[in-house]
């Protein structure tokens, strides 16, 4: 199959298996959920009554004081006591094998092509790391919410995009399923397309 280059009067021949396969919604959902789960820190930690600092001695005798009975200063109902169901550090990551991950990326890229959300250009670069230059370039292309993918990371482009809302720049090796579906449009250079094809082959 062929993808038309927007900034040149030519087309780029690409693999049908990468850019023309059927959309597998279940697979994409599983991989996106796993990717998001892997990004969770999971570092929360609270102390149970067994872990809180304090004496194990009964605060006062059981009967005769007129006060409510108490067996420990570490009780969850006391101030500074332990937490009843204390949250602990957790690894939320889910296993996704390489074949599934690559399959999901191919499904997403193919769907972007079908929905006319993937724009392929010969090259995408800036003369200087100026946000204004990038903003004007995107305005000329009628793009706002966009992910730009280049073969190698363009430093000028990366620096210029940092201050633009809903604009992100990646190199071909840095693509992920969540980023690909998060933006309205995806702009890829011809080099990036070839690199992604090799990566997913």
Curated annotation (Swiss-Prot):
GO biological process, one term: translation
GO molecular function annotation: rRNA binding; structural constituent of ribosome
Keyword rRNA-binding appears in the UniProt entry: yes
InterPro entries according to UniProt: Ribosomal_uL4, Ribosomal_uL4-like, Ribosomal_uL4_dom_sf
Spans annotated as Disordered: 51-73
CC annotations in GO: ribonucleoprotein complex; ribosome
Entries under Pfam families matching the protein: Ribosomal_L4 (PF00573)
Annotated keywords: Ribonucleoprotein, Ribosomal protein, RNA-binding, rRNA-binding
PANTHER family reported for this sequence: 50S RIBOSOMAL PROTEIN L4, LARGE RIBOSOMAL SUBUNIT PROTEIN UL4M
Assembly and binders: Part of the 50S ribosomal subunit.
HAMAP family, alphabetized: Ribosomal_uL4_B
Family listed: Belongs to the universal ribosomal protein uL4 family.
Function: One of the primary rRNA binding proteins, this protein initially binds near the 5'-end of the 23S rRNA. It is important during the early stages of 50S assembly. It makes multiple contacts with different domains of the 23S rRNA in the assembled 50S subunit and ribosome. Forms part of the polypeptide exit tunnel.
Protein name stated in the entry: Large ribosomal subunit protein uL4
Organism: Erwinia tasmaniensis (strain DSM 17950 / CFBP 7177 / CIP 109463 / NCPPB 4357 / Et1/99)
Lineage, highest ranks first: Bacteria, Pseudomonadati, Pseudomonadota, Gammaproteobacteria, Enterobacterales
Gene name linked to the record: rplD
């Amino acid at each position: 199959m062929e993808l038309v280059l927007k900034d040149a009067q030519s087309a780029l021949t690409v693999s049908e298996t990468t850019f023309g396969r059927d959309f597998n919604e279940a697979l994409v959902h599983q991989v996106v959920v796993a990717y998001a789960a892997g990004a969770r820190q999971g570092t929360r930690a609270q102390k149970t009554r067994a872990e809180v600092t304090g004496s194990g001695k009964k605060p006062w005798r059981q009967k005769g004081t007129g006060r409510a009975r108490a067996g420990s200063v570490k009780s969850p109902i006391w101030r500074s006591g332990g937490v009843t169901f204390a949250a602990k550090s957790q690894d939320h990551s889910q296993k996704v094998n390489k074949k599934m991950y690559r399959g999901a990326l191919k499904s997403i890229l193919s769907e972007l092509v079908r929905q006319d959300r993937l724009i392929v250009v010969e090259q995408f670069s800036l003369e200087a790391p100026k946000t204004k230059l990038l903003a004007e370039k995107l305005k000329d292309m009628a793009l706002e919410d966009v992910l730009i993918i280049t073969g190698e990371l363009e430093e000028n482009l990366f620096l210029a995009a940092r201050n633009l809302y809903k604009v992100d720049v990646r190199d071909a090796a840095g693509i992920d399923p969540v980023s690909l579906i998060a933006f309205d449009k995806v702009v890829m250079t011809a080099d990036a397309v070839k690199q992604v094809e090799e990566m997913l082959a």
